Amino acid sequence: MEVQRAQVGSERNARAGPKVPAWMGGQRYGGRTGVLLCTHFPSSMSDFAAFGAPDTTDFASTRVATAAAAAAAAFTAPASVPASALAADPELLRRAYRLMHTAAAMATLYEEEKTVAARYVHATARGHEAVQLAAAFLLTENDYAAPYYRDDAMLLGMGLRPFELMLQLLAKADDPFSGGRTYYSHPSLRRPGFPIIPHQSSATGMQAIPATGMAHALAYFESQALAVPGNEESRMRNEELEGGKHSQSSLPVSASKPVVLCSIGDGAMTEGEVAEALQMAILHQLPIVYLVQDNDWGISATGREMRAMNAYEFAAGFPGLRRLQVNGADFGSSHAGLTEAFAHVRSRRGPVLVHAKCPLLGHHTSGVRREWYRSDLATHQEQDPLPRLHQQLLAAGVSVEELAALAAKAQATVRDDWAEALAAPNPDPATFANHEFAPPAVTAEAGERRPAGAEKTLMVDAALHAVDDILRDFPEALFYGQDVGGELGGVFREAALLAKKYGDARVFNTPIQEAYIVGSTAGMAAVGARPIVEIQFADYIWPALNQLVEELSKSCYLTMGKFPIPALIRVPIGAYGGGGPYHSGSIESTLLTIRGIKVVYPSNAADMKGLMRAAFLDPNPVIMLEHKGLYWSKVPGTEDAKTFEPATGYVVPLGQAAIAQAADADKLRRGETALVVTYGMGVHWAKTASRDFPGQIEILDLRTLNPLDFEAVTAATRRHGKVLVLTEEPLMNSFAESLAGRIQRHCFEVLDGPVFTLGAANLPAIALNVELERQMLPSAAKVAAALGELLAY
C-alpha cells in the first residue's frame, strides 16, 4: 500500500485547527503532528494481511519493531459490509461520518494545542471511531453504559458536545461529569434522554464487574416484575439541561427492554475480574453486551506478549456466552454486528461478547507517545475508518461536496467549542471537599430500642431479623454472597431461611468471587437496586479491595454526588477461639485508610439491628463488621452482647458513639476514674476488666469507626483525663494508635497522663493453637493490668 506522511503545516495553519484531508481536496489531518495517512482505502478485511509490514524508518529499536510486526501480522477481522448494504440508511452514515470527523478533529486539535491540552493526561479514540459510534447509535435512553478511557467517539455518538468533553479535558468547573476532578473521557452521566453512565475508573478492566452488576439489577427487577427506577423520568426530554450548556441526546426514545453496554480494551481482557464478570453474566443470563476493542496494544506490550488468545477465542471457553467478531475499522461491519448483538440481548436477555479489531492511530495517552516505541504506525494507518467510510459514502451516491461540507462543519464546531472551553471557569478551590459522602438518611435514633414484651436475643439473630425486615420492607433490596442462599443460609446461620422466604432471585449464593460480590454493588446501585452482600470472613476480603477502592469509595466524590453507592457489605470478623490464621483476622485499620466508605462495628444485638437498618438506608457504601465471637455469646465474658431485641424499624445513626458503661459520679469528681475507648469485642474485655475497679471505668463504645464520633471521644476524655484506647488488631500503625495520637493532640491540656493503647501482638497472623492465640490477643486480664497502671499514673 502506498503510504505518505502528512506535510508539516505552517505555524499559523496549525493554530487554525484541523483542515480538510487531502482525499477531500484540502490539507491532511495532522498539522505539525506528522500523522500518517493512506491514499489507498481498503475495501475489505483481506487488506489486513498487509498488517505485517511495519514502517521502521524512524524507529531504531529492532526488538520493538519485531514485536510490532508480530502484532500486526495477527491483526485480522471479518469482511466489511458491502456498500450496497450501507446505502439503506444514508442518514446514519452521514451522521457517523460527521462524528468521525469531529473525533478526529478533536484528537488533532489536542496535539496542536498540546501545551494546554496535555496538561492533564488523556487518550482519544483515533482508529476506534467506527465501532464506538456504531455502539452509541444502538443505545437508548433506557440503557446503561460503562465506557472506557478511549471512548470519546462513543460519547459523541450518544449526543454529547465536544465542548462538554473538552471541559473535562481541561478540568474545568463545568465539566458535566466530574467538575474537574477526573480525567478526560471518564464520564458519569445521569441526564434525561441519555443512557445512564455511572462512575468510570482508569484501572483496566474495572468496569466489567460494575457493568455486570447493572445487568444483574435489570434482571432482578424483571424477575420481580418491578419497574426499573428512573426509566420513566428519563423519557422526559423537555427538561431544561443546566441552562442550555449541555447537549440534548440524539438517541431514540425506546420502550424496549434495557441493556447494558460494557466497553473494554483487549489488554484488560486478561484481568481476572473480567472472568468473574463473565461467569456471573452466564450463570444468571444477564442482559449485557461486552464490546472488546482490540488494537493489539497494551501501552507498549503487544498482544503476543500479553495474552495467549484474543477475546473472541477467550469467549469460546464460556459456554452460554454468545460471541461475534466485527471489523472495528469499518462502520458497516461494526453496526451490523452490534445490531445483532443488541437485538439478541434485548430479546433473549443473555450476554453477548463482540470482538472488534481496531487500528490504534493515536498515542496510548498524551503522556505515552507512539513514536517512542511503535513501528507499526503505517500499517495501522492503512485501516483508518474515516477514509474507508468516505469511500463507502461516495459509492452510496453521496457527493464529494456534501462530504466536504460535513467535514468542514465538524471541524468548525471543534474549533468553536475549544475556544468556549478554554474560556470556561476553573473549579472553586473552596469546593474541593464537597461530595465525599451523600447526606445520610438517618440522623437520629428512632424506634423502640426495648419494646414491651421484648426478649433477649443473640447478635446473630438480631442481624438475621434486621435483614429479614429490610427484605420485607424494600422490594429493591437483595442479599447475596458465598453460602448465604440455599439451605445453609450462611456459615454462621446469619441468613438462615431467607432464600426460602424471598426466593433465589433475591437471596442467592455467588461463586468464590469477592471482587464481584463487592464491585457489583456499584452497578446494582446505579440501576436502583439496594444490595446487601457478605464476605464470608474478613480474612478473604482482599480480592475485593480493588473494587472497593477504585469504584465504591470514589464514585460519589468523582461524580459530584450523582452516583453515591448505597451498598451494605457485611463482614464477619475477629477471633473466636481456634479459628486460626485465615478465619480470625481483624482488618478495620486497612479499611479505614479508604476514604469514601463508612465502617460500622457493633458490640451488642440492639446496636446490630439498629445499625444494620441505618447502614442499609445510608446512600453510601457501608461495611458492617460483625464479630464472630459475639454472634452467639459463647465466648466467656460476652453475655452482654445479648440484649432485648428492638422493634422493627429501629435505627441507630451512623457516627454516634454510646456510653456502654458509666463511671461513678463521686469517683469522677474525685479524679479516680479512667476512660476506655473501644468497639466490638473490646467493649466486653473492658467490662470484665472493670470489675477490678468498681465505679472507676467509663467505657465508650464507638459503634461507628468512620465517620468517627470524635466529639464524644473528646468530651469523655475531658471528663476523666486518663484514656486507654483498646483494639483487637495488632497495635502498631493501627486505627487505635492513630486515634490515641488525635486524643493526645486535641486534649493535651486536660490529660493526666499519656494516652495508653492496648492491642494484639504485632504478628502477621493469629496462630491456630488456642494457647498461642491467647498470648497474642488482648484479654480482660491484660486490660485490667493496663487500667491499673493508668489509674496509678
Where are these regions (language model features)?
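Cofactor-binding active-site loop characterized by glycine-rich and histidine/acidic residues
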Residues: 105-108, 112-229, 252-284, 302-319, ...
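Active-site nucleophile and cofactor-binding loops and adjacent substrate-binding regions
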Residues: 120-128, 149-150, 187-208, 326-331, ...
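Short, basic, low-complexity termini and linkers enriched in Ser/Thr/Gly/Pro
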Residues: 4-8, 25-44, 224-256
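A short, small-residue-rich loop immediately preceding and capping a beta-strand
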Residues: 118-122, 145-147, 199-200, 227, ...
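A glycine-rich helix N-cap at a beta->alpha junction
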Residues: 171-177, 282-291, 507-509, 553-571
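Conserved acidic/glycine
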Residues: 44-131, 137, 228, 356-502, ...
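Glycine/charged-rich beta-loop-alpha catalytic/anionic-binding loops adjacent to active sites
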Residues: 112-117, 182-201, 258-261, 296, ...
